[in-house]
Amino acid sequence: MTPQAKTPLDLDPIPPFERLTRLLEEAEHETSTARTQLEQAHGQMAVIQRERDRAVSTIRKLNREAFFDLARRAEQRDGESPLHTARIGAYSGLIAASLGSTATWCELLEGAAQMHDIGKIGIHDSILSKTGPLTTEEWRLMREHPRIGAAIIGQSDEPLLQLAGEIAMTHHEHYNGAGYPLGLCGRDIPLAGRIVAVADFFDALTHDRSYRKALPVDTVLSMIRERRGEQFDPQVVDAFMSIAEQIKQTRQRMVEKERIYQATEGWDGDWWMLA
């Protein structure tokens, strides 16, 4: 009788069950190793992402500071009160809150509003510092500062600068369509522009300029009421008037800070943080 040929399995000294167990253990080890390597890779990616986020945050901070500084320089060239832009930001934030806007948007608006006149950096000093009436041509050039401001900051993908560009372009629009540079009217004017229009008007007329003295606060409040529905959005005016006492207190506080800071520190620090 011829002996039956043995298969490789018959020649393997390791019992089938034990062999299967070893294969499973090896597979589990390889899986564990792969999992560890994947976790390490994820950890490295997380570190890289954190470093990237920090770098982006730093760049955005420097970018914001550069634009704030540019707004300050435009303000100084125009002969504005040293904290004009900071006050505009503070008033705008208060008005937005009175309108029921979110705290996040109010904070964003407060920062963005401070760059409303950044476009004046592109207007010649002879026009900005002129004490007499502007000629027709000078006035035409002056009315370009909203477009200039929007061109400077409006192309950014950062929310603060996007809103600042929107404000720069629209804060001289009138509710009745008689403003500039686009001739927008009503709700076609972005809310931020409608808010800053009131804040800017109030602050500009309650502080001295090279060509006129400041008007009494209550006189300016009456002027804003008279322009309700014409130059200014009725709802924004109503919101402003509902917090008029708070606006007055904020103005007085910032005027005092301006006086103290100007006497002791100068204007080279974080001036926009005094609000």
Regions found by a protein language model. Give the residues of each.
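Metal-dependent catalytic cores of enzymes that make or break cyclic nucleotides
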Residues: P3-P8, H29, T36, G43, ...
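Amphipathic alpha-helical coiled-coil "transmission" helices that mediate dimerization
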Residues: T7-K61, E65
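Short FAD-binding loop at a beta-strand-to-alpha-helix junction that anchors the flavin cofactor
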Residues: F68
